Amino acid sequence: MANRKLEKMASIDVHLRQLVPGKVSEDDKLVEYDALLLDRFLDILQDLHGEDLRETVQELYEHSAEYEGKHEPKKLEELGSVLTSLDPGDSIVIAKAFSHMLNLANLAEEVQIAYRRRIKKLKKGDFVDESSATTESDLEETFKKLVGDLNKSPEEIFDALKNQTVDLVLTAHPTQSVRRSLLQKHGRIRDCLAQLYAKDITPDDKQELDEALQREIQAAFRTDEIKRTPPTPQDEMRAGMSYFHETIWKGVPKFLRRVDTALKNIGIEERVPYNAPLIQFSSWMGGDRDGNPRVTPEVTRDVCLLARMMAATMYFNQIEDLMFEMSMWRCNDELRARADEVHANSRKDAAKHYIEFWKSIPTTEPYRVILGDVRDKLYHTRERAHQLLSNGHSDVPVEATFINLEQFLEPLELCYRSLCSCGDRPIADGSLLDFLRQVSTFGLSLVRLDIRQESDRHTDVLDAITTHLDIGSYREWSEERRQEWLLSELSGKRPLFGSDLPKTEEIADVLDTFHVIAELPADSFGAYIISMATAPSDVLAVELLQRECRVKQPLRVVPLFEKLADLEAAPAAVARLFSVDWYKNRINGKQEVMIGYSDSGKDAGRLSAAWQLYKAQEELVKVAKEYGVKLTMFHGRGGTVGRGGGPTHLAILSQPPDTINGSLRVTVQGEVIEQSFGEEHLCFRTLQRFTAATLEHGMRPPISPKPEWRALLDEMAVVATEEYRSVVFQEPRFVEYFRLATPELEYGRMNIGSRPSKRKPSGGIESLRAIPWIFAWTQTRFHLPVWLGFGSAIRHVIEKDVRNLHMLQDMYQHWPFFRVTIDLIEMVFAKGDPGIAALYDKLLVSEELWPFGEKLRANFEETKKLILQTAGHKDLLEGDPYLKQRLRLRDSYITTLNVCQAYTLKRIRDPSYHVTLRPHISKEIAESSKPAKELIELNPTSEYAPGLEDTLILTMKGIAAGLQNTG
């Protein structure tokens, strides 16, 4: 591509360079990376759409940069007048260009982080974004800290590590707003950029990489960013599973090798046993039916079979490599006898359909004989799952397949033992050990599927049963009566109902789900989670339904407490459950409880939710200890701060003491999956962070808060909840204001997830799901649900006694939980901009509601000031120049998209809004005989004026990418 250097075009570089704060060090290549990607992109844009369009992008960027300098509302209006003068086709191209530039800025940032990590100039434990995290929980560092600072012996560390489990639960929450087709192209752009800056690159390599970089940037820009149909749960499952294929499958053994190395460095010569459950994976995709009518029993069945087929395929693809390696002839007697037996029973022509080792394997290669048999079984296991998935039945006999994990591990363990006993331990600890570790981690099911259902749906089923049996209405019984009946049925043997039970569609759906659980292998499933659980009968009901539907190995039942009142009542509910003898005997000393971050935040605001979650965990652990039960907390965190997100290791280290105890389950949601597992190095970093932080929390628990800190926070939480609820639930016109001032009503058009955005189609804020609630406020850069309530709470305690300010500063310095809470809010303020929110108000909100918006913005400014006072900071993010720089580099792009979104919403909602269009500026559109049509025709069914809907969706995606948050 001609290397045009138009005078005008140099200015984006200039702006970028001016934005860099002086403090950022020499090793920082971010601006260089950013400028390179941008230059390439603008060249491509000019080639495709002409110089005029490139100049318009430039002009918009400059207006935005000027606004970022002084925050004058006039600048936003100038931006608006340029944007509204564009014709529909150009408008789509511009929105797409800015969205694309933000994605490129994110990629530049990721490459820069990897570069800085390599040159070891990392400060440990800063507070920043998850994705950029210079926040580290490095295993080597953690081990050194535990041995050096805490005098833990290497043996104690090894013991704790062998017995700890982190279970990462992938959920397809509708927050992954980037299409998979684009994610793959982004990965290749990242690779090209990293290689371009490698030390030993030749001129030819450089030229080829540069061409590849341009090709990938153009391919990404030419891909439709918008999903034209909503994904089904099966699509979500396949998208989630693709991460296993791409990074997790190979990432786990690689990570466990690094654990071995780190242990060796502190003097432990043993390796982590291959069956130590250090990392486990579960999934909600296709199992989470809470409020999602599209997740049917058939979907659950399909998803389990698909995962089994994928697991068998990945093992099968690896087994031949292992056979190549295992060419040894020395073996112990046990293996020799088995190999002879397998050889005698094998058919000569049985292996014709394999590429390698297709003839009968001689007994002089005993390991290959054994592994050949494993290969046959894997082949049949895969075929059977494939046939069951395709047509519901299979002609592959079950005995030709692997039925359970023990059966799969047994021949591999035999090979391992034999190699060790013949002096070939180093060989055993090679690929065979990696394979054993994969089998132990992924099993035959790849992931274990959790089932989640609302407690009301179980009540409906039991009510139908008791009504049918003429013993009354279960729904109307008291909790005592319910428990008494459930326990008498659980202790008895008779079946409760037959095929004559009258069933509505909903009841059949619940019962059929239990039948699917009974039909499929037990290792396909993890937990049965009950949302909106409040009482012991909710848990006993699921136990009874599992028994009635003949589930041979019942799933563990996990109550989920989400709303503030439910969290407060959770310890008492769990204590009542443990006091039921039947249940206590059933659980074998182990119980899991899930706590929800999203709904509690929507219900009471971030401060009260965070504090209540902290207290509920402390209380739950006390209750469990009292009854001699080991409790696992399952954290339902979202990606955004409003939904419990934030850097992993800080989140773990700020949990109350004693609440993790080497066993942690946590959801990895939506776009966080891509940030955690999108690349090999990200996957490694994620596994390392979770493992190191869980170990550190157990061996070096955070301090318990002082009684006076608790009392202060209790008082603050009451004030914060009062203010939050007085605005969100009690202000009569709030819902109207929210719907006008944000793109909430238009959110559903993004086709991100398979779940409806509301629990009930009518209804106000209560029925809105937490994700669109947060999404809408994130889009306007106002982030209301995150900070609302903090300001009045801090102001209240300082006005009451000025010494409380010192106490708050003391809490910030010495109490990890409080520090993390305040730091997260500070980061959100750094991403916020009330000036942008004011533009939405001016354009979209009716005039009589303007004072309401002004009041909220004044509250934003006051809260920001008080948060800085509490942290002892003069300026937002003053302790983290890197994050500050990165946010400033993104702001000008995001501002253009915000203004574009606000004016587009105005035109969608008010068709009579007058705009003066200028002629086409895109060369591609102007020179085409069908002007602007092509882009607009991608969305032929839009009910709005041409191009508006696509422009709106592109701005939503761009802003989400820029803030690195969707919902």
Curated annotation (Swiss-Prot):
Its EC number is 4.1.1.31. PROSITE patterns: PEPCASE_1, PEPCASE_2. Optimum pH is 8-9. Keywords: Allosteric enzyme, Carbon dioxide fixation, Cytoplasm, Lyase, Magnesium, Manganese, Phosphoprotein, Photosynthesis. The active site is at residues 173, 602. It is an enzyme of class 4 (lyase). Its main location: cytoplasm. Induction: Upon inorganic phosphate (Pi) deprivation. It holds the Pfam family PEPcase. Expressed in all plant organs, with higher levels in roots. Magnesium. Can also use manganese. NCBIfam families: PRK00009.1. This is Phosphoenolpyruvate carboxylase 1.
